[in-house]
Regions:
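Basic, low-complexity terminal or inter-domain segments flanking catalytic cores
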Residues: 4-6, 87-88, 109-486
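Short Lys/Arg-enriched helix C-cap and helix-to-coil transition segments
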Residues: 106
Length: 486
């Protein structure tokens, strides 16, 4: 987030050419990115009304191996990619499927399915209970003389990778059906053959400037047809071309853009980052993210995960006084040591000695500055909880609509900051739960809020109770003292 806020966008230009061969059109991009408008104009002028020449052609077949069986981390990341489902929700659903005997134990780090689980028996049950109308999908696998799923590298001595039991499903909700279907199709795809694609790359010389066109086509779907619709390849084609062959340039155009800051994390790639930094385990990482959201240290919207003011303050305060405690190196070292203890490679006593040595100075520093640290966090926590600017007051146009928590009722509501100055009595009720963020201004002049609840998606509402965009303008009661929803 610090890198994002410090990013200064620089203008860049992309140049694209539209080429033609025997009535077939395709696009190619200038290989280099241009950083000033004068060079852009120079290239456009140099390429205008010119013919291109095929400078180089690269073709090769690309083999795509089947996916590995799911461990809990892979399942969480895949469910987020496909369904935008949070890791915590995915894990909770997987546990419910396990308790219903529909899948194996989900809290596993293994990517290996041992023969002892009974490949054939599971496939037979899946065919009978889930593929009655399309038995050929499973029959093609069962016809093989030797059944062997594609295995991953990660092992868990306690549990195999996640797999479906094949038992007939009972009454499931929509999310449970989605996760179960994903697990079933992932299991089937591990028995699939390699997929094969044909990759083509053509370099075109236009008056000394080089454009690159790419194409990708499927030669053999292999395991992909077993995993559909959860994986697909965008196919594109190029006409038949030869090196040194002239080619018609139909159009050359430039588009201006700006350099972008690093993308914010989402819950899936944050899991990857935590894994690479050695923070948490496959079973605890989703819970850690969920806890940070619950405590309002971070929040997630459609743009990704962002730290709140409270989260930033805690980070900066701890970094200032006890940076060792928030070091990922210390956390990673501790997680590694715990794993060694589980595997019998380290004694608990040795870990205790290490921790006493590593944490001695940080703990002393913390105790020495405990009062200062507490006051800094307390101040921002009070500000964060009791006051948040939402936008201009629609009534007086002078004050700010701020989020206030009533000291008497403990309920929160919006009120004009000019109340004590001018007596402006503009107020609006807000939901008593959920993370609130301003979205935009409604046609009625009042703010539209973006609100996220635990395990629910974001939704929006105008805070003006008589506006048609207010989700609560019908059949809800308001507290007369605070004007808050009851």
């Amino acid at each position: 987030e610090i890198k994002i806020s410090g990013h200064v966008p620089d203008p860049i230009w992309y140049i694209t050419g539209k080429f033609e061969k025997d009535g077939s059109f395709f696009k190619a991009n200038l290989i280099s990115v241009i950083h000033n408008s004068s060079d852009t104009e120079k290239i456009l002028s140099a390429c205008k009304s010119q013919r291109g020449t095929i400078d180089n052609i690269v073709k090769f077949d690309k083999i795509i191996s089947p996916p590995t069986p799911f461990n809990v981390s892979n399942l969480q990341k895949e469910a987020y990619r496909i369904f935008k489902m949070s890791p915590a929700t995915t894990f909770s659903i997987a546990e419910s499927l396990y308790l219903a005997a529909l899948i194996s134990y989900p809290r596993t780090s293994s990517q290996i399915l041992p023969p002892s689980i009974g490949y054939k028996q599971i496939l037979e049950r899946l065919k009978m209970n889930y593929f009655q109308t399309n038995e050929n999908i499973v029959n093609d696998i069962l016809k093989r003389e030797y059944l062997a799923p594609y295995q991953g590298k990660e092992e868990d001595p306690a549990h195999p990778a996640i797999y479906p039991t094949g038992i007939k499903q009972k009454k499931l909700n929509v999310l449970q059906r989605k996760i179960l279907d994903l697990i079933i199709k992932r299991f089937l795809s591990t028995f699939g053959n390699n997929a094969v694609t044909k990759y083509s790359e053509v370099t075109i010389n236009v008056n000394g400037y080089y454009f690159l066109a790419k194409a990708n086509g499927i030669l053999n779907k292999g395991w992909i047809h077993l995993y559909e619709p959860y994986f697909s390849i965008n196919e594109s084609n190029l006409p038949e071309l030869k090196i040194s062959e002239p080619i018609k340039v139909n159009e050359i155009k430039a588009s201006e853009d700006y350099t972008r800051p690093p993308a914010r994390y989402n819950q899936a790639n944050l899991l990857d980052k935590m894994e690479s930094e050695g923070i948490g385990t496959k079973s605890t990482r989703a819970a850690i993210i969920n806890l940070l959201i619950k405590r309002k240290y971070i929040f997630q919207d459609k743009n990704g995960i962002e730290p709140t003011e409270l989260g930033f303050t805690i980070f900066n305060t701890m970094k200032k006084f006890v940076s060792e405690i928030i070091s990922t190196k210390l956390t990673s070292s501790l997680e590694s040591s715990i794993k060694k203890i589980q595997e019998g490679d380290l004694e608990i006593g040795d870990l205790r000695v290490y921790l006493e040595k590593a944490l001695s100075n940080p703990i002393n520093e913390f105790k020495l500055n405990e009062s200062t640290i507490g006051n800094e966090i307390k101040n921002v926590l009070t500000s964060f909880e009791n006051k948040m600017s939402i936008g201009k007051c629609p009534k007086c146009q002078k004050g700010e609509m701020i989020l206030i928590r009533s000291s008497k009722t403990k309920k929160r509501f919006l009120a004009c900051s000019q109340y004590r100055v001018t007596g402006c009595n503009a107020m609006a009720a807000v939901p008593q739960k959920g993370l609130i963020k301003k979205d935009s201004t409604c046609h009625c002049g009042w703010p539209i809020l973006h609100i996220m609840f635990a395990r629910k998606r974001w939704w929006t509402t105008c805070v003006n109770r008589i506006c048609s965009n207010n989700r609560y303008n019908i059949a809800h009661h308001y507290d007369s003292e605070s004007n808050a929803l009851i």
